[in-house]
Design a protein with these regions (language model features):
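N-terminal targeting sequences that direct proteins away from the cytosol to non-cytosolic compartments
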Residues: 1-149, 156-167, 176-221
């Protein structure tokens, strides 16, 4: 079973009932291309997902070994005890971005992250949210070329299942491949941010997403 692409519209009304939420899984837009485990080795994910144009995208990231990979179709790792986590979102790029992550407005990433059917928007709209840092970096590809990543730091107040507001901090690393934005989110409760900042930053900076080259079939004589 695969997830449908993430919709970026924001719900205007109130929260969904807890009973309804228990029957659903957060929609991430991730469509994995393999049924095997994405764990390459302990603390390392290596997998392929489908982009908007149908092509395969190789994704990888590292995480602390005490974190666990969540079951199900999503790429989601977490420290269950402390609520630290990292997960991947995939969404079609805005048409006017022309395939460039630099041209995507910052609000787009927040709309995807806080979509009503997502991890943080499921219990109600996330109205209190703030971008504290944002920049574009160029990272080397194996070919020697460069690939742009939008890197952001945010703070926000999502609702919990019992309708309490909790402050969280997150780091976002996003790049564009195959007509999709691949958005990697690493975060924790705000009261833990100073303590685990370096750990989260290592996870955040480890994320890579690159197009997979497919060999053309040999021509017949």
């Amino acid at each position: 079973m695969t997830n449908a692409p993430v919709q970026t519209t924001v719900r205007a009304n109130g929260p969904v009932s807890t009973r309804a939420l228990l029957k659903t899984r957060a929609v991430t837009g991730v469509e994995r291309l393999s049924a095997s485990s994405p764990l390459f080795r302990p603390g390392q994910v290596l997998d392929e997902v489908r982009a908007a144009d149908g092509s395969a995208v190789s994704v990888s990231f590292a995480f602390p070994r005490q974190w666990v990979l969540a079951e199900g179709p999503n790429l989601d790792v977490r420290d269950v005890k402390e609520s630290d986590s990292a997960f991947l979102l995939v969404a079609p790029l805005p048409a006017d971005a022309r395939g460039s992550i630099e041209a995507v407005p910052e609000s787009f990433f927040l709309d995807v992250l806080f979509a009503p059917q997502g991890k943080y928007g499921a219990y109600g709209a996330v109205d209190e949210r703030k971008i504290t840092q944002s920049r574009v970096v160029s990272l080397p590809l194996p070919s020697g070329e460069k690939q742009a990543y939008r890197r952001m730091a945010i703070s926000f107040f999502p609702l919990t299942y019992n309708q309490n507001l909790v402050e969280r901090r997150a780091l976002i690393s996003a790049t564009a491949v195959g007509g999709s934005a691949l958005i990697f989110v690493t975060g924790c409760l705000a009261n833990r941010y100073k303590k685990v900042n370096e750990v989260l930053r290592d996870v955040h900076e480890s994320f890579r997403a690159t197009g997979t080259v497919r060999r053309k079939p040999a021509s017949t004589p």
